[in-house]
A protein has these predicted regions:
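Conserved beta-loop-beta/alpha segment of the NTase-like Rossmann-fold superfamily
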Residues: 102-208
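Structural beta-sheet core signal
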Residues: 45-47, 93, 166, 191-194, ...
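Catalytic-core segments of class I nucleotidyltransferases/pyrophosphorylases
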Residues: 163-165, 172, 176-185, 197-202, ...
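N-terminal glycine-rich phosphate-binding loop and ensuing alpha1 helix
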Residues: 39-108, 139
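Well-ordered alpha-helical segments embedded in enzymatic catalytic cores
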Residues: 78, 150-154, 251
Length: 297
């Protein structure tokens, strides 16, 4: 996760109740993706899922980082459930490194979440206890070496003309996405980033006379950093030159200089999965039954 130097000046956090405009579809009229009859239309969520995960290579050698599992489900699934809990069901996934693993997962989704019976003689398959999510997922090959900005530019044709969500495929939070969207719309900006305080990564030694008398977990950081969970206008694509553009550098810095970038301060839980230690910590939280990011029922 790259820290961005970006907080827009003198922006006050204002949270209001969500109005009916949140339900407007971000899908253009000529887009082939259609919402099923009776299905709630939602803002699109774009998830960056093309990275190699070099700092957690033990887990990402054969699969992309967003497919590393927590509790038997890819972290990508957990992120999508966070959005789904807020009524967001339309996803665009930016694939890259071993993107076919992500495509295969969704192509065989029922095989992962349901019991099935195969009648070999009749060449039939029966799915039991269907656990289908109300999701519409567009998987886009954005290149193995494409930078974060370039990946967004490559999926621009799927974004329509409305504001959309964007986040990284390796970070979890208990963020109120409806409040985030309302905050963004109240600021009259092109982009809003969720700012978070980084979790402590190293234990602090308490010593007395050269002897360790206690070990305390390092407290949460005090500086605000880029935590992902953006809300963006499609106009931000104009700030991206091409595949080589790093979203967290030139585009965000330009938006900040122009006063078009807001920061939504999230004081709650946020944790990236950058290392094997992070993965084990998140796995422990999930196994305890008290995972803070589990905002769905």
């Amino acid at each position: 996760m790259i820290q961005a130097k970006l907080i827009a000046p003198s922006l006050q956090r204002r949270i209001h109740s969500l109005d009916s405009s949140v339900g407007r579809s971000a899908v253009p009229a000529n887009d082939k993706r259609r919402h099923r009859k009776g299905e709630q239309q939602t803002v699109i969520a774009v998830i960056l899922a093309g990275g190699k995960g070099t700092r957690i290579s033990e887990e990402s050698y054969l699969r992309p980082k967003p497919m590393i599992e927590l509790g038997g489900k890819p972290i990508l699934w957990h992120i999508m459930k966070i959005y789904s809990a807020a009524g967001v069901y339309d996803f665009v996934i930016c694939c890259g490194y071993r993107g076919y693993v992500i495509k295969s997962y969704f192509a065989n989704y029922f095989m992962h979440v349901c019991d099935v019976t195969f009648d070999i003689a009749r060449n039939q398959m029966q799915v039991h206890q269907s656990a289908a999510e109300p999701w519409k997922v567009t998987l886009v090959d954005t290149g193995e070496e494409t930078m974060t900005g370039g990946r967004k530019k490559r999926v621009a044709k799927y974004l329509g003309t409305e504001d959309f969500f964007l986040t990284y495929g390796d970070g979890l939070a208990d963020i109120d996405l409806k409040a985030l969207l309302e905050f963004h719309r109240a600021q009259n900006v092109l982009a809003t980033v969720t700012s978070v305080r980084p979790p402590g990564r190293f234990g602090a030694l308490v010593t007395d006379g050269g002897r360790v008398i206690n070990i305390r977990e390092k407290p949460q950081g005090t500086s605000w950093i880029n935590g992902g969970f953006f809300v963006l206008s499609p106009k931000v694509i104009n700030y991206i030159q091409g595949d080589h553009t790093v979203w967290e550098v030139d585009p965000l810095e330009s938006l900040a200089r122009e006063g078009k970038l807001a920061a939504y301060e999230h004081e709650g839980f946020w944790h990236p999965m950058d290392t094997l230690r992070d993965k084990n910590q998140l796995e422990g939280l999930w196994g305890s039954g008290k995972a803070p990011w589990k905002v769905w029922t």
